[in-house]
Amino acid sequence: MTDRDTPPSLEDISRRLTEAKGGADGAEADGAGSSGPARASGLGIGMRISIELVTTIAVGGAIGYGLDSWLGTSPLAMVVFLVLGGAAGVMNAYRVVKGLDDSVGLGRAIERKEKAEGNKDRA
């Protein structure tokens, strides 16, 4: 574009956009350009799982400590709620890994996943 009076052609603009994107059009067709769980990185999923495990155990411990302080049952409630918090954390991690957490309510998510798997089997 040495001459400023002539506008660039549409083909030239399209070619330059494709070069600037780095050929991303082919990547989007593969699903890499989509949003949601398909685009989530392994590091992001790992961080989410670890945060959920830590927070559920911490919340369980806090509830147990509060109940122990209130009721005077020294380590009993804390141990019970730490175990319950750990179980809740493992259950949440399982949901994340299986992809069952993308809708409200586990039942709806399971139904949607079963429908999707049924459609894959038919194809």
Swiss-Prot record:
InterPro entries xref list: Atp1_alphaprobac, ATPase_put
Q: Name one GO biological process term.
A: proton transmembrane transport
- GO cellular component terms, semicolon-separated: plasma membrane; proton-transporting ATP synthase complex
Give the subcellular location: Cell membrane
Residue spans of biased composition, Basic and acidic residues class = 1-19
One Pfam family of this protein, by short name?
A: ATPase_gene1
Keyword list (alphabetical) reads:
Cell membrane, CF(0), Hydrogen ion transport, Ion transport, Membrane, Transmembrane, Transmembrane helix, Transport
Topology in the lipid bilayer is annotated as: Multi-pass membrane protein
Where is this chain primarily localised? membrane
Outline the segment boundaries, as ranges, of region: Disordered: 1-38
**UniProt superkingdom:** Bacteria
Q: Biased-composition ranges for Low complexity?
A: 29-38
The record lists the membrane-crossing segments as: 43-63, 70-90
Described purpose of this protein according to its UniProt entry: A possible function for this protein is to guide the assembly of the membrane sector of the ATPase enzyme complex.
The family classification in the record reads: Belongs to the bacterial AtpI family.
Please give the name of this protein: ATP synthase protein I
Q: What is the lineage of its organism?
A: Bacteria, Pseudomonadati, Pseudomonadota, Alphaproteobacteria, Rhodospirillales
Q: Which gene encodes it?
A: atpI
